[in-house]
């Protein structure tokens, strides 16, 4: 049975523990960044940050400042278009693991031409893949494939202190998502699940997706 994540943003405090744990587990170096007037750091996904917590600050109709936090990562699509696009250029550059549902960029992705690698990245409806300028490989969340294959949770899920993130069999996560949604609606009437049928990373949002991030949802 394929796996799935549930990311309940109503519980997220933007501690960024998931973001840091991901870097540590994948042994990725620190990024040198500059203050841009936002708490979001780094400003975007990059080859050294496969997961980031996005910050969206706005003022509601009552003049109250509202924060919306969005832990962004690859959605591990049920039907990943990135795999199809990559296969047309270099078969096996991107694959989907049948057992877990993880969408993975392999070492063959370094053989993609710059134009083909760009096409793979631009095919993603969630703007996830990045191209490592040093290795030329496509980089993105790999569902902690090594950990999951060994029966462990992804490191971001294990690290999360608030229960924002959950991981398990897809059917179990769908059931948990519906349960969490029912609870969230008692506090957030506009709460909803995003692109449930199309992805393996199910987001529960308290408000419209536009209040989180441009690519928070596709449908």
Swiss-Prot record:
Its cofactor is [4Fe-4S] cluster. Induction: The trimeric FdhABC(3) complex is the main formate dehydrogenase enzyme in the presence of molybdenum. [4Fe-4S] cluster 2 binds at residues 22, 141, 144, 156. Optimum pH is 9.5. InterPro entries: 4Fe4S_Fe-S-bd, FDH_Electron_Transfer_Unit. Keywords: 4Fe-4S, Electron transport, Iron, Iron-sulfur, Metal-binding, Periplasm, Repeat, Transport. Residues 3-32, 132-171 form the 4Fe-4S ferredoxin-type domain. One of its GO terms (molecular function) is 4 iron, 4 sulfur cluster binding. Its main location: periplasm. The keyword Metal-binding applies. [4Fe-4S] cluster 3 binds at residues 74, 77, 82, 124. GO terms for cellular component: formate dehydrogenase complex; periplasmic space. It comes from the Bacteria. Optimum temperature is 51 degrees Celsius. Gene3D superfamilies: 3.30.70.20. Binds 3 [4Fe-4S] clusters. [4Fe-4S] cluster 1 binds at residues 12, 15, 18, 160. Pfam families: Fer4_11 (PF13247). It is found in: Periplasm. Heterotrimer of cytochrome c3 FDH2C and formate dehydrogenase FDH2 alpha and beta subunits that forms the FdhABC(3) complex. Beta chain of the formate dehydrogenase (FDH) that catalyzes the reversible two-electron oxidation of formate to carbon dioxide. The beta chain is an electron transfer unit. This is Formate dehydrogenase 2 subunit beta (cytochrome c-553). It comes from Nitratidesulfovibrio vulgaris (strain ATCC 29579 / DSM 644 / CCUG 34227 / NCIMB 8303 / VKM B-1760 / Hildenborough).
């Amino acid at each position: 049975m394929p796996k799935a994540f549930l990311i309940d943003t109503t519980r997220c405090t933007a501690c960024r523990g998931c973001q840091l744990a991901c870097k540590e587990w994948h042994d990725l170096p620190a990024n040198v960044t500059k203050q841009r007037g936002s708490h979001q750091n780094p400003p975007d996904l990059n080859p050294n940050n496969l997961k980031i917590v996005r910050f969206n600050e706005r003022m509601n109709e009552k003049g109250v400042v509202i924060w919306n936090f969005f832990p962004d990562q690859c959605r591990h699509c049920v039907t990943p278009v990135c795999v199809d696009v990559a296969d047309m250029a270099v078969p096996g550059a991107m694959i989907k693991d049948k057992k877990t549902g993880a969408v993975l960029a392999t070492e063959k992705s370094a053989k993609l031409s710059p134009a083909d690698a760009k096409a793979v990245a631009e095919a993603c409806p969630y703007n996830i893949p990045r191209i490592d300028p040093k290795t030329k490989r496509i980089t993105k969340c790999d569902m902690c494939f090594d950990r999951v294959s060994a029966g462990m949770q992804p490191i971001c899920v294990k690290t999360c202190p608030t229960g924002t993130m959950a991981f398990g069999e897809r059917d179990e996560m769908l059931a948990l998502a519906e349960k969490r949604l029912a609870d969230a609606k008692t506090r957030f009437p506009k709460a909803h699940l995003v692109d449930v049928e199309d992805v393996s990373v199910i987001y529960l949002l308290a408000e419209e997706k536009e209040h989180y991030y441009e690519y928070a949802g596709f449908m």
